[in-house]
Amino acid sequence: MTSSNISICATEDQMVLQTSLLLRVNVILMTTVAIFTFVLTYRALFILKQRPIFHKSTKILLYTSLIFVNIHEIIFMVIQCVAFIRSFTLSDKPCEIMRTTLECRFKNHVLIFGIAGMNFNQFGLTVDRLLATVIPQTYSHLGSFPGILISILVIGCSIAAPLIIAIGDPYDDIVPNCFFFPQHSAPRANVFLIILSALVIASIFLNLIIIFANKKLEKGTRYYVSQRYQKREALISTRIIVYIAASQFLGMVLYSTIVLTLRLHKSMIPVSMYHNIVWWAYTVPFAAVALPALLIHRINLVGSNRKRVINRITAKVETQEEHMKSLKELWG
């Protein structure tokens, strides 16, 4: 089938969807989430620079994660805002309101690049934490090298993801929005969604093992200050990564599970209902905003705990001094 003999006009159901209040509310909500992501990212970058909680390698990977998050939010906001404008300006033009997958190709590729990068880099953070646990001495001397190498691999895999999904796709069908996968790429898109879910689940599982291992190792190095500091740093970093992985898990598993289920039963679902559910099931922006938000929260929490410990020690010293002063006065 070629693009010349395919109808580009929207059906009655598709027109209802494209001009519905639900779509417009969804766009406003997701755009608000994107703006929050940008603001929180700025704050997270500032805190990452100021607070020396993470190893250089981990910090580079966190910077990479924030870049992917914002690439995704920028392209998704552009896609959504275009859909919002078209829902008003083309509300009476059914043969113009739909998008061809060919004209959506670049935006769709960038969107998949962002989604893949967010998830692949999350797994990269887990590998980084694994290295810090298994070979702590070597890892500490490698500096930023592991983070740079993993980031390069993540970027390469993320570039490859949309290209592999689109292999052989003629781009001859129409979609209501550029974040929908082309029809001919659907089987590979389904595999992609399954891989993302599997990676997130693996990340959480491995991070929990790493936390347990670091707790055990920390007890075993109680009297070795340098080694205990390394284990404590690894434990704190890994806990933060687990919280981030959990947010990614909720966002990606919800999205991939719902969308995969819809794809497998697409023939049984009315068109307008199918696309409405897909729009609202796209929970990736919430996973995106959770990254800088959780980074800020967890780093501030670590800082507050440290201050509390220091204040407790200081208070204890002052109490001892007052006690000695009292004894001197008593015996003086």
Curated annotation (Swiss-Prot):
Q: Which InterPro entries match?
A: 7TM_GPCR_serpentine_rcpt_Sra, Nematode_rcpt-like_serp_alpha
Keyword annotations from UniProtKB, A to Z = Membrane, Transmembrane, Transmembrane helix
Cytoplasmic-side positions: 48-64, 133-146, 213-239, 298-332
Annotated Gene Ontology MF terms?
G protein-coupled receptor activity; olfactory receptor activity
Report the record's Gene Ontology biological process terms. Answer: detection of chemical stimulus involved in sensory perception
> Which stretches are transmembrane?
27-47, 65-85, 110-132, 147-167, 192-212, 240-260, 277-297
**One Pfam family hit:** 7TM_GPCR_Sra
Query: Which GO CC terms are listed, alphabetically?
Result: membrane
Q: Does the keyword Transmembrane apply?
A: yes
Subcellular location per the Swiss-Prot or TrEMBL entry: Membrane
Please give the superkingdom of this protein's source.
Eukaryota
User: Cystine bridges: which residues?
Assistant: none
In what way does this protein cross or attach to the membrane?
A: Multi-pass membrane protein
Which residues does the entry place in the Extracellular compartment? 1-26, 86-109, 168-191, 261-276
* Family as reported in the entry's similarity comment: Belongs to the nematode receptor-like protein sra family.
Q: What is this protein called?
A: Serpentine receptor class alpha-10
In the record, what lineage is assigned to the organism producing the protein? Eukaryota, Metazoa, Ecdysozoa, Nematoda, Chromadorea
